[in-house]
Amino acid sequence: MQVRPFYWLALSFLGYYCAYGVFLPFFPAWLKSQQYGEEMIGLVIGSAYIFRFAGGLFFSSLIKKANHIIIALRLLALASAIIMAAMSLVAHNFWLLFIAIGLYASVNSAGMPIGDSLASTWQRQIGLDYGKVRLIGSAAFILGVVVFGGMIGWVGEQNIVWILTALLSFYTIIQLLKPTIPPKDEIPEDSVQNDVGFIALLKNPMTLRVMIAVGLIQGSHAAYYVYSTIYWTSIGISVSQTSLLWGIGVLAEIVLFFFSRRLFQNISISVLLYISALACVGRWAVIGYIEDFWLIFLLQLMHSLTYAVCHYAIVRYITTQPQSHIAKLQGLYNGLSNGVLIAIFTAIAGMIYPTSPAMTFVFMSIIAAAAFFVIPRKLNAFLIVQHK
């Protein structure tokens, strides 16, 4: 069966982000159901972020031609489903489970940058509307969190791996569809300049400060990603209610992205980063002390400020840089914010959480506050004016 590129990519994002919407909030709950403690969970999930970083870079580097992208997505999806199914067989052997989680994180993480590479290829090739396709991915994340989160509340946390296996199998099957227009290679005009290294990019003081600031802001979400579900269920909030809390946060993110250009086109990147950092400080400072469901529900709306505003700001910064730098700057952003730093902060959170869940989130607030000291003071949308 053949489908148009827009629908092929939309279905691919649907499968990937629906499974990710179950894995991110609920996999720690599955580990807890297998009798692993909070400190061990923090270590395992923190290590998984390192594997995600390494896997994303490794598998992406293997793609040499555009027509390899879809084949890679199919193989990575199949491997993800097989490894997830195998986790149920090794759940009670820590080291085998650790290896399985590392392998899963490596192969599954590559689906995100490779999928975005396919979107970029089709965007240049046929004018694909990436924004609309990516919104389907965000909506799929909500579907995974809310619908399948509710199912988890019914069947129990011990069956999370089987729900994930089913979703990843669906993701694998829809990858087998054939696009009507295959992705094709094109040689960029500035390809001869596209040899700048990561270290060379970070030698730019402005880029270094922006990347560190964004890494601190995004990294401060570490405890939220790993322990929010565990914490909320420990204070009497049901798994199905927890899924609603995750869902409303992502919904707020989608709404902000939809209106972001209208809201922020005249606001400098520096101000946006200050707004996001301040929101993180406030959100993490109080989240561990609120036990009322509806107050937490309202607090979750701040995800639009703590995550979406920061993401919008860094993407806008990257678009102002030379074309030959953009791909590697995206890699630095994802590697630092969603890999190395969040892995470190997750491991630290795992050591604090058994003693005090509230202080775990307060520590995240302190991390976000540190961003204030590195955010460039005057960095607007299109031109670097001044930094101190």
UniProtKB/Swiss-Prot annotation:
It is found in: Cell inner membrane. The keyword Acetylation does not apply. One of its GO terms (cellular component) is plasma membrane. Its main location: membrane. Keywords: Cell inner membrane, Cell membrane, Membrane, Symport, Transmembrane, Transmembrane helix, Transport. Residues 1-4, 67-70, 120-130, 177-210, 260-269, 316-326, 379-388 are cytoplasmic. Residues 32-37, 97-100, 154-156, 231-234, 290-292, 355-357 are periplasmic. It is a multi-pass membrane protein. It comes from the Bacteria. The chain crosses the membrane at residues 5-31, 38-66, 71-96, 101-119, 131-153, 157-176, 211-230, 235-259, 270-289, 293-315, 327-354, 358-378. GO terms for molecular function: lactose binding; lactose:proton symporter activity. PANTHER family: 3-PHENYLPROPIONIC ACID TRANSPORTER-RELATED, BLL5896 PROTEIN. Belongs to the major facilitator superfamily. Phenyl propionate permease (PPP) (TC 2.A.1.27) family. Probable permease involved in the uptake of 3-phenylpropionic acid. NCBIfam families: 2A0127, mfs, PRK11128.1. This is Probable 3-phenylpropionic acid transporter. It comes from Haemophilus influenzae (strain ATCC 51907 / DSM 11121 / KW20 / Rd). The lineage of its organism: Bacteria, Pseudomonadati, Pseudomonadota, Gammaproteobacteria, Pasteurellales. The gene is hcaT.
